Amino acid sequence: MQPDFKKIHSFENNLINKRSLKDLMYQAFLNYGIVKSSIIADRVKNLTFHFATQSGVSLSVEDLRVPAKKRELIGLTRNEVETTQKRYEIGSITSVEKFQKTIDIWNNANNFLKDDVLTYFRESDPLNPLYIMAFSGARGNISQVRQLVGMRGLMSNPQGQIIDLPIKSNFREGLTVTEYIISSYGARKGLVDTALRTADSGYLTRRLVDVAQDIIVRESDCGTTEGLWATELASNNFLNLRGRLLAEPIFTQEGNLFAPANTEITETFLQTLKTLKDHSPIKVRSSLTCTSTRSVCQNCYGWHLSHSKLVDLGEAVGIVAAQSIGEPGTQLTMRTFHTGGVFSGDLTRQVRSPMEGKIEYWEGHKASLFRTMHGKMGFRLKEEVNLIIKNSFGTTISFEIPAESLLLVNTDQYVYENEIIAEIQKDTNLILEEEQKEIYSETSGEVFFNALDVKVQADKQGNTYKTNNKAGLIWILQGSFYELPAFSETLLKPGLNLSKNTLLSRTPLYNKYPGWVQIDKSDNGTGICVQNFSVTLTNAFINEKVENSSRLQIKTDNQDFQFQLTTEPNSVLKQGDTIAVLDDNTYRTTTGGIVTYSLENPQASKKRKSVKNLFKGYFYWIPEETFKFSTLDEVRLSFSKNESIVGVGEEIMPNTFSKVGGFFQIKEAEQEVTIKPGELFELTSAESQIFDKSDRFVKPGNFIVPGKIITQQLVYLEFFELNEKQYILARPVQVFEVPKEEDLSLSQSFFPYNSHEHIKLKVIKRVFYKNWEKIISNNGINLLQTFIVFDFKQEQQGLEPRLEFTPSKVPGKSFLKIALYEVIKTFENNRKSSHSSLPTTTRNFVSNKQYVASNTLIGQIETTAGLVNKLAAINPHLNSGNMKEVLILNPSDLKKVFCPNVELLKKVSVGDLVRIGTLLNDNVKSPYSGQILEIFEDHILIRLSQPYLISAGTILHATSNNLVKAGDILATLVYETIKTTDIVQGLPKVEELLEARKVLHNALLAPCPGYAYVRFNKHGESTVQLIGLDNEVQTLALKPGIKTKFNSGDFVEVSSALTDGLISPHTKLETLFSYFKNRYTSFEACKLSFKLLQLFLIGEIQRTYRSQGVDIADKHVELIVKQMTSKVCIEDSGTTTFLPGEVLNFQKMADIALVAENKGEIPPSYVPLLLGITKASLNSDSFISAASFQETTRVLTEAAIEGRKDWLTGLKENVIIGRLIPAGTGFNYLENQERLAREKGEIDATFHREAKPLSENILDLRLVKKE
């Protein structure tokens, strides 16, 4: 290969780093070809390995040198952060600006530290192993070195937002616990990204291969004269023309031919072209404009990039393009992992003053006033500005500030060395998203709006909210926040001085029900109750504290019943509560067993605490002992007794003895031992034949064994087999009778006498076991228990039942009484808020045991100030039904500022709001932010206040003159932020573009080129007025809150974005076609629309990759985008047989339309269609390829119904069928086959023309063929 451009190399004694090595290999490859380059690479490898082995480089802890300047730099940075905090506290910047400024301060500190690390290594320790390793390209990078010996820096949280607490330590010094926790965010994110996104990248590659696999270089020249201008290329870089062919000749300024069409653009060509002063525009051939059918030609594709010469015929360039775009996705995934999730804010480049001096520039430049992200005011430049700095020695420095930059200085302003004078935005197409940040009040106080323009707006649901349309301040005038009791009456007005016992408010207390007053005094305050109703048991006495519990004795005519109380006196009762349980062992068993019963009240047998009447019936108890064991060793001694009869008192397990004796069984599966009392009878074989073997009861006098054994008592028969013999166990049954006891009744005395319907005490009996339930117990159980329960039907709200003991005439005995009380809520026992800490007392207007009618004023709650202070405000927006809010000024909320002769030189008045640094008189600045409360002869009294700066567009939650607590939301700042360009945005963004997905919140696009203006109607609604080149006026509605991307009067191109938001490619295509179809034919309009959309998509995809530091040749992206924009959809079939909605290839459609026109028929009308890579694959001409990708059944079914043919033109369908693929060597083979077929076809055609006169029908023709 002849070299096109040789760089003259001479001996250089320099350090070769990664970049130099890359440049060396690039030059070798460019000038000497693949073979020689590989030899050079091999020799370089051997050389470096040899010396690396000899040097024995090893990394130790001592090699990690932390720069000495680090401590000083961290100190300076902290001071700068503190200054920013002070600016925020005086209301000069918003919380968002403070956050952004803090992040930028730490980011700049990090970058300075990184430079220090590099300077130290380069100048003081160039042979440091860490430095050699990172900068030779062996392992690691500058970011990792910075984290090792500089500082770890700022981290992002899982939501992608930056944490404003930087990690100041490095890995050499070690992280603190807090830093370690924050640090782990990024590390985890990197690991998760690596795992998840690799799968996404692989799937993206598969889809790309599927859409482009049939693009093969099939011919040398398609013969097109079309191409792309150099300015239209996505990279827009002069060097990226290399490897393409000229579509049009280039002429010099004099009109001489410099290069003819189809000239290859090489390095030499470009170097020579640079020497020309002026030349005609460069137009190059591109895959986008190639007219080859289902392929691309050599001249339009250009060089094969791996060996810098024209691509060969048969090259599968589609596969190469798909892999070139898909493979970097895997690299992008790892991007976060390499930097450990560390944030790097390289979005703007700061221009600093190179020296001290005065700034000069022409003031007539177009610019708009702009507030930076840090809260500084500056100018957004619309055009380039020439900046000049002059110092006192006459030295002048001038430099250019490009358009769209931020200028932060005025003309004639004096600047210092290293002062930031401008910010240049690196990428004008950054991803902006709207964010919200809530502002919380740091103190309690009164809200005051200063210079805000409040407007009420409504959302789509009709909910109203307040917004601020102008930057201003929200002041919180400090004070202590208190809540007064509900329905309280405020006695004072704001501004009054308060003493310790000044009465602030009073709350009247009324009773709802009549009754007797009961006043309880405790540590929690005074409680007032009104007894409305009571019931007393007159035939029941309480013996207090008998055997550590209270006993209830109920006397009837026949006997006394003893109950044990289960409820403590003075306790509050609920419906169904148990008051007492009867001491009765009548229904108690000695062991466990099986219970069954026959009762007249079956509902009472259910296990629930319901109030039921007394019932009668019988319990049948079959006793049985059950013992649980954990290991077989515990029952090993009893194995010999298994399945035999044991006696009473016999030892079953260690220290465990049988109480009843009986049939002994060991059940290993259940880990239990059972002893069933009863007699065991063996059955003969004859008896077992006629015996009813079901378990059952046998009444006294009946046979147990027919004709043999009669029982004298009720028994329960159980049948079982033992050692192949059959036995009956007759188990004794205990019968417990439940008589209907009518003598146990409660004599109840009610007061008032007419109100006894809704409260009662009832005697009920409860069974707690289900019928036929087996109960495991060694100590016995109560089958039936008698209870006294509380029955309460609450018809009147607000009454509380309580159990009480009423003294009787007999000493040591009391009556049982239940009383209903209305509890009057006082403020002491109703305190729900932590802010209600003002002293309160309850004043009673009634005495104990006094009878009161309903709605009587029985007392009031009084709230006092508690300290010597001042009442500042009462919340005016609360009605009397809610808790009232007051603000009280304590001495700590007021500050004195001494000012001599203040009246003579004062610059402030009472009521003024001042910030820190405001002049109070000619000599004294205010050390506090606040409100001037009073001015005295020698001092000023300031009420401390906190100002919050609010930007335009902020949503307001607080109202002026309202009171707020510390932590209440005041407002929500709405601002724009730049998304961190991490892979989480990168790879999905590429996928979104390639899949041509619909975009939410898309930008408004210009329907035609023209001059754009923003107009407002009388309702305040904004519209965009577009005056086209033909003076046609179009009006476009703007949604509320949407920002425009142009200034009124700017010229906008067709389909350019007029508002903020993402551009939807589908909307862009529709806009372009609707504009062009009125000016050109359908074919031309479609072609133009596709071309502009293709350039847009290529630009967007390339921008996303380049923002991640990945470089892909434009020609690869062009091939994929061409596949996405090659289909049209038929709208009207004309006189053809096509159906509306049918999707066809654009070139095929153009040919059909041309034929229809030539024949005088109406051609079909169609619109351009943008397909994502998945849909483009499924709409492939080859149904075999489409079916092997996705939706196999649907694709094959449709192909069968339509009777489609697959011409096997691509690689995939040939692989599936098993044929030779038409690429590489297979391409030449198939070319030869086609050539032979063509030649044979020509011979056959000649023969047919001669054979035709012999016969007119096909049969004769076949006969002639056979001959």
From Swiss-Prot:
Alphabetical keyword list: Chloroplast, DNA-directed RNA polymerase, Metal-binding, Nucleotidyltransferase, Plastid, Transcription, Transferase, Zinc
Where is it localised? Answer: Plastid, Chloroplast
Quote the record's binding site residues for Zn(2+).
C222, C290, C297, C300
Known EC number(s)? 2.7.7.6
- InterPro entries attached to this UniProt entry: DNA-dir_RpoC2_beta_pp, DNA-dir_RpoC_beta_prime, RNA_pol_Rpb1_3_sf, RNA_pol_Rpb1_4, RNA_pol_Rpb1_5, Rpb1_funnel_sf
Where does this chain mainly localize?
A: plastid
Q: Which cofactor does it need?
A: Zn(2+)
SUPFAM superfamilies this protein is in? beta and beta-prime subunits of DNA dependent RNA-polymerase (SSF64484)
Q: What does this protein do?
A: DNA-dependent RNA polymerase catalyzes the transcription of DNA into RNA using the four ribonucleoside triphosphates as substrates.
Which HAMAP family does the UniProt entry name for this protein? RNApol_bact_RpoC2
**Stored PANTHER family:** DNA-DIRECTED RNA POLYMERASE (PTHR19376), DNA-DIRECTED RNA POLYMERASE SUBUNIT BETA (PTHR19376:SF68)
Describe its assembly.
In plastids the minimal PEP RNA polymerase catalytic core is composed of four subunits: alpha, beta, beta', and beta''. When a (nuclear-encoded) sigma factor is associated with the core the holoenzyme is formed, which can initiate transcription.
| Family membership | Belongs to the RNA polymerase beta' chain family. RpoC2 subfamily.
Name of the featured protein: DNA-directed RNA polymerase subunit beta''
Source organism per entry reads Emiliania huxleyi (Coccolithophore)
Q: What is the lineage of its organism?
A: Eukaryota, Haptista, Haptophyta, Prymnesiophyceae, Isochrysidales
Underlying gene: rpoC2
